[in-house]
């Protein structure tokens, strides 16, 4: 067995551990996949696409958001824009928004920055989910482009939630 197939097998086994009944096993798998970093991204995206299990998908989004690899940009942006049927999905959207911030704040690629920023601005100005608006504000603060700051200034004027408005003020200070 060569090193590449060993790595694929190891990554696949870690991803499959998300189905384990014991939370410590799932947590350890998340930690290991994050440590492995970018080499896991394509397999994580494929596993996400192949599954209908929202809990499994949520674990994948958590890992992808923490890795912050641009290959996950499209998936994270899709998750941010997904309509929410329950509270757990809302949490996943917030994690995805933070992942977009990490990706955009750690690259110099203007196309990647603009794509992430556009989805985050939408998340800041559109959703009824205050937690998603909060996560978008934090991520736009990380990106810190003139467009991100302008969006925060626009949003703070219309924000009705005091916690989100406070976070926007911090982001603008």
UniProtKB/Swiss-Prot annotation:
One of its GO terms (cellular component) is phycobilisome. The keyword Repeat does not apply. Keywords: Antenna complex, Lyase, Phycobilisome. The keyword Kinase does not apply. Pfam families: HEAT_2. Gene3D superfamilies: Leucine-rich Repeat Variant. One of its GO terms (molecular function) is lyase activity. An enzyme involved in the biosynthesis of bilin. Belongs to the CpcE/RpcE/PecE family. This is Bilin biosynthesis protein PecF.
């Amino acid at each position: 067995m060569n090193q590449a197939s060993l790595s694929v097998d190891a990554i696949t086994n870690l991803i499959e551990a998300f189905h384990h009944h014991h939370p410590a096993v799932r947590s350890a798998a998340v930690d290991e996949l994050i440590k492995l970093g970018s080499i896991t991204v394509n397999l994580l995206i494929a596993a996400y696409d192949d599954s209908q299990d929202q809990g499994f998908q949520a674990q994948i989004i958590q890992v992808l958001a923490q890795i912050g690899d641009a290959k996950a940009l499209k998936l994270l942006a899709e998750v941010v824009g997904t309509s929410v049927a329950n509270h757990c999905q809302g949490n996943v959207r917030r994690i995805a928004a933070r992942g977009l911030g990490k990706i955009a704040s750690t690259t110099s690629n203007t196309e990647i920055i603009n794509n992430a920023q556009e989805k985050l601005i939408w998340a800041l100005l559109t959703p009824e989910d205050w937690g998603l608006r909060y996560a978008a504000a934090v991520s736009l603060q990380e990106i810190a482009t003139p467009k991100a700051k302008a969006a925060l200034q626009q949003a703070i004027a219309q924000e009705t939630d005091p916690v989100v408005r406070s976070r926007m003020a911090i982001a603008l200070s």
